[in-house]
Amino acid sequence: MATGGGAEEERKRGRPQLLPPARPAARGEEADGGREKMGWAQVVKNLAEKKGEFREPRPPRREEESGGGGGSAGLGGPAGLAAPDLGDFPPAGRGDPKGRRRDPAGEAVDPRKKKGAAEAGRRKKAEAAAAAMATPARPGEAEDAAERPLQDEPAAAAGPGKGRFLVRICFQGDEGACPTRDFVVGALILRSIGMDPSDIYAVIQIPGSREFDVSFRSAEKLALFLRVYEEKREQEDCWENFVVLGRSKSSLKTLFILFRNETVDVEDIVTWLKRHCDVLAVPVKVTDRFGIWTGEYKCEIELRQGEGGVRHLPGAFFLGAERGYSWYKGQPKTCFKCGSRTHMSGSCTQDRCFRCGEEGHLSPYCRKGIVCNLCGKRGHAFAQCPKAVHNSVAAQLTGVAGH
């Protein structure tokens, strides 16, 4: 045959002849591989039985039933032994990216855990973003911004109750004789004090009220008003029956006054008080739990400002020959003779004249004119003082000494 002859010619020429692959040998190798796979499956099953985690073999897939691969038929395993499943193998070793620890409770728990973790993560991110966008403001920042004056306007009074440069002018005369707002602004503030209209932010009077609230544009203007007021209030008659309040909350006091003689007239007490402080209300009698008068008077006052600060009332004083005592919260204890706070009058070595009120000599050796201890003017004593109740026309007509 030509084919056989061609092959012989090739052998004669010394060329190697390519032989077809040996199929029976390949089938034998597959059979050997099948036996190796069967042996590994048996080992896995034995390990699973020892651990108690052996699972029933699942039914074969359709691809396996249809005989899509020849390897399954070539296994030739014993009856009842199925191909190993992935769940039958032990957990993968450390470092295997596909390995994971199986939950004994089943895979049904994992979705809930993952969902809860995702929600917690989103909630933390949202809180962090909100904290970054809305930084908590400094306490009181809104109030400070509201009190800050506008840039295009002159500095005015700030919010109510804070930073207001305010005084209150009160009329203490008869209600029917209360002056108008024009008198307070024109005669008192502008003419007597000498303020400029641009220094004043507002002058407020409630209809029917005897109080005038004066708001200044700065603390300097307020200080100027108070300084001039202390000078003019005793010199000019226009300030009679007027008092200025609201200079300092610490200057408001509840005063108690006591005399050994209960016949001292309350109007004389008010006259003496007006020399040293501003009387906000008429003194009233203090009674005990039985309703009996204790001899004390109580009233609300406002201390005045001096060069060194608040000017306090003396703890002891005289109205005529009657000695009176005063006290209030915060009143310093001073010597009656020299006014020192380091000692009392019992140990004081300073001489003081009770006739003229000056230091350095005693009353029997006084060569100066007498000074009234009620009104503070020189030239007459308390008995002849025109401001004393017993010298008033009303007292002479009625014969009442002021009770």
UniProtKB/Swiss-Prot annotation:
<keyword id="KW-0238">DNA-binding</keyword>
<dbReference type="GO" id="GO:0032481">
    <property type="term" value="P:positive regulation of type I interferon production"/>
</dbReference>
<dbReference type="GO" id="GO:0071360">
    <property type="term" value="P:cellular response to exogenous dsRNA"/>
</dbReference>
<dbReference type="GO" id="GO:0008270">
    <property type="term" value="F:zinc ion binding"/>
</dbReference>
<dbReference type="GO" id="GO:0003690">
    <property type="term" value="F:double-stranded DNA binding"/>
</dbReference>
<keyword id="KW-0963">Cytoplasm</keyword>
<comment type="function">
    <text>Nucleic acid-binding protein involved in innate immune response to DNA and RNA viruses. Binds DNA and RNA in the cytoplasm and acts by promoting recognition of viral nucleic acids by virus sensors, such as RIGI, IFIH1/MDA5 and CGAS. Acts as a co-sensor for recognition of double-stranded DNA (dsDNA) by cGAS in the cytoplasm, thereby playing a role in innate immune response to cytosolic dsDNA and DNA virus. Binds dsDNA and probably acts by promoting sensing of dsDNA by CGAS, leading to enhance CGAS oligomerization and activation.</text>
</comment>
<dbReference type="InterPro" id="IPR042509">
    <property type="entry name" value="ZCCHC3"/>
</dbReference>
<keyword id="KW-0051">Antiviral defense</keyword>
<dbReference type="GO" id="GO:0002218">
    <property type="term" value="P:activation of innate immune response"/>
</dbReference>
<dbReference type="InterPro" id="IPR036875">
    <property type="entry name" value="Znf_CCHC_sf"/>
</dbReference>
<keyword id="KW-0677">Repeat</keyword>
<keyword id="KW-0391">Immunity</keyword>
<dbReference type="Pfam" id="PF00098">
    <property type="entry name" value="zf-CCHC"/>
</dbReference>
<feature type="compositionally biased region" description="Gly residues">
    <location>
        <begin position="67"/>
        <end position="79"/>
    </location>
</feature>
<feature type="compositionally biased region" description="Basic and acidic residues">
    <location>
        <begin position="47"/>
        <end position="65"/>
    </location>
</feature>
<dbReference type="GO" id="GO:0045087">
    <property type="term" value="P:innate immune response"/>
</dbReference>
<dbReference type="Pfam" id="PF23058">
    <property type="entry name" value="RBD_ZCCHC3_2nd"/>
</dbReference>
<keyword id="KW-0694">RNA-binding</keyword>
<dbReference type="InterPro" id="IPR001878">
    <property type="entry name" value="Znf_CCHC"/>
</dbReference>
<feature type="compositionally biased region" description="Basic and acidic residues">
    <location>
        <begin position="95"/>
        <end position="121"/>
    </location>
</feature>
<dbReference type="GO" id="GO:1900246">
    <property type="term" value="P:positive regulation of RIG-I signaling pathway"/>
</dbReference>
<keyword id="KW-0597">Phosphoprotein</keyword>
<feature type="modified residue" description="Phosphotyrosine">
    <location>
        <position position="201"/>
    </location>
</feature>
<keyword id="KW-0399">Innate immunity</keyword>
<dbReference type="GO" id="GO:0009597">
    <property type="term" value="P:detection of virus"/>
</dbReference>
<feature type="compositionally biased region" description="Basic and acidic residues">
    <location>
        <begin position="26"/>
        <end position="38"/>
    </location>
</feature>
<keyword id="KW-0862">Zinc</keyword>
<feature type="zinc finger region" description="CCHC-type 2">
    <location>
        <begin position="352"/>
        <end position="368"/>
    </location>
</feature>
<dbReference type="Pfam" id="PF23057">
    <property type="entry name" value="RBD_ZCCHC3_1st"/>
</dbReference>
<dbReference type="GO" id="GO:0003723">
    <property type="term" value="F:RNA binding"/>
</dbReference>
<keyword id="KW-0479">Metal-binding</keyword>
<feature type="zinc finger region" description="CCHC-type 3">
    <location>
        <begin position="372"/>
        <end position="387"/>
    </location>
</feature>
<feature type="region of interest" description="Disordered">
    <location>
        <begin position="1"/>
        <end position="158"/>
    </location>
</feature>
<feature type="zinc finger region" description="CCHC-type 1">
    <location>
        <begin position="335"/>
        <end position="350"/>
    </location>
</feature>
<dbReference type="GO" id="GO:0051607">
    <property type="term" value="P:defense response to virus"/>
</dbReference>
<protein>
    <recommendedName>
        <fullName>Zinc finger CCHC domain-containing protein 3</fullName>
    </recommendedName>
</protein>
<dbReference type="GO" id="GO:0005737">
    <property type="term" value="C:cytoplasm"/>
</dbReference>
<feature type="compositionally biased region" description="Low complexity">
    <location>
        <begin position="128"/>
        <end position="139"/>
    </location>
</feature>
<comment type="subunit">
    <text>Interacts with CGAS. Interacts with RIGI. Interacts with IFIH1/MDA5.</text>
</comment>
<keyword id="KW-0863">Zinc-finger</keyword>
